[in-house]
Design a protein with these regions (language model features):
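Alpha/propeptide regions of enzymes that mature by internal proteolysis
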Residues: 2, 9-12, 26, 53, ...
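Single-stranded RNA-binding regions, centering on S1/OB-family and related RNA-binding modules
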Residues: 561-563, 572-731
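Mobile "lid/hinge" segments at catalytic clefts and subdomain interfaces of large enzymes
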Residues: 144-263, 460-556
């Protein structure tokens, strides 16, 4: 039985439907907005023992048939996920993952759970990513899987200070804000955005508006679940270890406080681990080799797990008491060291940004238009001229794992940093280079994506990229227990792990350029969000000041090893002259000058070269090719062909005109070949063009003989009849 709920939101109808397809899944829904439609199914397999994490998999795929297209490339079938698909997977995963109860995710026998979303139709106006988030929540809500939702997801734009709900693609091009918010009926749980220096106050207002719409979407899902929702599966309660935990807390809790205050990430981690092992051995000694475990003693693995929980709780209590593990106050920023030009200038720009025990080594490359990334998705194909790639190697945290390409986390962090910097990049007209940033995390103890933003901004300035404003980023945290609340600036890795919120903010001194927030608790009030944003602004300004000590503004010139560029504009109708037949002319210019030449349809010609002299040489050749032949001007031209009625002379590269026999000399000319030969360089004057635009030339006018009007004519009996006389004109 097909059941649907509908509601008009922002002038279009949002429809959530279930019961038509994928009836063997635990839950499945179709969500439609305009003509964009997304399907999502959720399933759960048999439980597995021994898992120490929640095996949730989110998969989002965009089928090109949804846009009436074929996949690009040789193989006409969807392959590995695109960057957009990976980012959307994260957009779905992040808000729903905390919404599964502990009795499901921490059960000794935890089940593999998958969320599979597919785009079935796209109207080129409404992005399917937010609809996939709604569809995933709705599918979980009508399924028998335990879920603490529903969740709503909405996109918000900002045009001329007006907040736009579910903006279209065209509206987003004008918008200062691309904000995606997810939340429950009571609170916001996830925020993701790129912005053009939007103020903190406007950001809070936009998030508040998003939450109003989220409530409407949640109501729709509740209505659907009431109609056709399956009874939720019964779960066994988690073992009650509260008494054992309380005993351990009385005995060992204060010891954790001392160990947590150890200076240094690895020293602190080792001190806590050694303390846990010592406590474990004291409570439940490991049996000697070959001996059986004492059944009267607590289970060693359970004791270790409870002690780890106590270590986490101890850090939270320590923070709420006003002390952080590294001794900082809530608003203190770790020591910052920023350097630029740390790599040889073969690298077009570089920086090393260190904040505490987090370090980003940034390298920047400047390229030509050929280096732009072609993006072929469901919409029109386009090119990206700015990219940032983030790498998180194992050595950055002192560990070892195989490097098999970027993981979803690396792609997500890289895109967050890219958004933060993209909105201060110069326009293509002002800086026509393609720009690539690589951020290699050399050390990590929290906030590595924001270190990439800071290092990236410095690297761009070192490369001579005239960004509008320098950008800094900061990661904020939250620890909340009842009425006690601690908002933390520049969080450590352990504060991220044990806290209730991970809140990253990047921006200039004037406003926010990127924001990402994930909340592990049921939600955060708008007042608390506003307070966190304001505290983040103070930290951001402090970091900017420290960064600018290394380099106050973009360098005046680019690296000598970066490609040089000259841009000129020509008449679009003359593009063919530069290209030549079969590309012969442009290839010749490029080979002779050692340049790369790109021509846009609007007549903008871009000349690239590592040698400025070569670029100038190519410019001169192009300008000569496209120069207009001017009437009454004398040219040194080359005779390229001889006819009975005159000769054709090349006066500018690729531009020929006719010197009629009557314009070769005073008096009667019997044979053209008697006066000129092919290859001769002769002076000619341009007499203008005929009614077909063909160039008319005169040799005798250039030499001062005659008036250029063709006053010398042969006797009628010797008049040539071949070739149609002067009606042939020039070419």
């Amino acid at each position: 039985m097909t059941v649907k709920v509908e509601k008009e939101i922002a002038g279009r109808t949002l429809t959530i439907e279930t019961g038509r397809v994928a009836r063997q899944a635990n839950g499945a829904t179709m969500v439609r907005y305009g003509d964009t439609q997304v399907f999502t199914a959720v399933t759960s397999s048999s439980a597995r023992f021994g898992m120490n994490f929640f095996p949730l998999t989110v998969d989002y795929r965009e089928k090109t048939t949804a846009a009436g297209k074929f996949p690009g490339g040789f193989i006409k079938r969807e392959g590995r996920p695109t960057t957009k698909e990976i980012l959307t997977c994260r957009l779905i995963d992040r808000p729903i993952r905390p919404m599964f109860p502990d009795s499901y995710t921490k059960n000794p026998a935890v089940a593999d759970t998958s969320v599979a979303a597919m785009v079935l139709s796209v109207d080129q106006e409404n992005d399917p990513d937010v609809l996939a988030g709604i569809s995933a929540s709705a599918a979980l809500s009508v399924s028998d899987l335990p879920f603490l939702g529903p969740l709503g997801t909405v996109r918000i734009g900002l045009i001329e200070e007006e907040i736009i709900v579910f903006p279209t693609h065209e509206q987003l091009k004008e918008s200062k804000l691309d904000l995606v918010v997810a939340g429950t009926m009571d609170a916001v749980t996830m925020v993701e955005c790129g912005a053009k220096e939007v103020s903190e106050e406007k950001m809070v207002e936009a998030i508040a508006k998003a939450h109003e719409v989220i409530r409407e979407i949640v109501e729709m899902q509740n209505e659907l679940a009431e109609k056709v929702g399956k009874p939720k599966m019964e779960l066994e309660d988690l073992p009650d270890n509260s008494e054992q935990k309380a005993e351990l807390k009385v005995k060992y809790f204060e010891g954790f406080r001392e160990k947590l205050l150890t200076e240094g990430k690895h020293a602190r981690s080792s001190a806590v681990s050694e303390y846990i092992s010592a406590c474990q051995d004291e409570v439940s000694p490991e049996p000697e080799e070959g001996a059986e475990a004492d059944a009267s003693l607590p289970d060693r693995d359970l004791v270790k797990s409870l002690l780890r929980d106590l270590a986490d709780e101890s850090e939270r209590e320590l923070i709420l008491s006003g002390t952080r593990t590294d001794g900082r106050s809530y608003t203190d920023i770790r020591d910052i060291n920023a350097e630029v030009g740390v790599l040889p200038n073969r690298v077009h720009g570089s920086s090393l940004f260190t904040r505490g025990e987090t370090q980003s080594l940034v390298s920047v490359a400047l390229g030509t238009g050929k280096d732009q990334q072609i993006v072929d998705g469901l919409g029109e194909e386009y090119k990206e001229r700015f990219t940032l790639h983030y790498n998180f190697p194992a050595f950055s945290v002192g560990e070892s794992w195989p490097n098999r390409g970027p993981k979803r986390r690396e792609i997500g962090h890289g895109m967050l940093a890219q958004r933060a910097l993209a909105n201060v990049m110069p326009t293509e007209e002002d800086f026509p280079y393609t720009v690539r940033i690589i951020s290699d995390i050399m050390e990590s103890n929290g906030s590595s994506s924001m270190a990439s933003v800071c290092g990236g901004a410095l690297g761009l300035m070192d490369a001579g990229v005239n960004i509008r404003q320098p950008v800094a980023g900061i990661a904020m945290g939250l620890v909340k227990d009842g009425d006690k609340t601690a908002i933390l600036s520049d969080i450590l890795g352990s504060e991220d792990h044990n806290g209730d919120m991970d809140f990253k903010v990047a921006g200039t001194q004037f406003g926010i350029t990127a924001l990402q927030m994930d909340i592990k608790i049921t939600g955060v009030s708008q007042e608390l969000l506003a307070e966190a944003l304001e505290q983040a602004r103070g930290g951001r300004i402090h970091i900017l000041k420290e960064m600018l000590k290394a380099l106050g503004k973009p360098r005046d010139d680019i690296s000598p090893f970066a490609p040089r560029i000259i841009q000129i504009r020509i008449d679009p109708e003359k593009i063919g002259l530069i290209i030549g037949p079969g590309g012969k002319m442009i290839k010749s210019i490029q080979e002779e000058t050692g340049t790369t030449i790109e021509i846009e349809n609007d007549g903008v010609v871009t000349i690239w070269s590592t040698d400025m002299e070569g670029a100038k040489g190519a410019q001169q050749k192009i300008e000569a090719l496209t120069e207009e032949v001017q009437a009454d001007r004398i040219y040194d031209g080359k005779v390229v062909s001889i006819k009975d009625f005159g000769c054709f002379v090349e006066v500018l590269p690729g531009q020929e005109g006719l010197v009629h026999v009557s314009e070769l000399a005073d008096g009667f000319v019997d044979k053209v070949g008697d006066l000129v030969s092919i290859g001769d360089i002769i002076k000619v004057m341009c007499l203008g063009t005929d009614n077909q635009g063909r160039i008319k030339l005169s040799k005798k006018a250039a030499e001062g003989g005659g008036d250029g009007d063709g006053d010398s004519k042969p006797p009628p009996k010797e008049r040539s009849r071949e070739g149609g006389g002067d009606r042939r004109g020039g070419r």
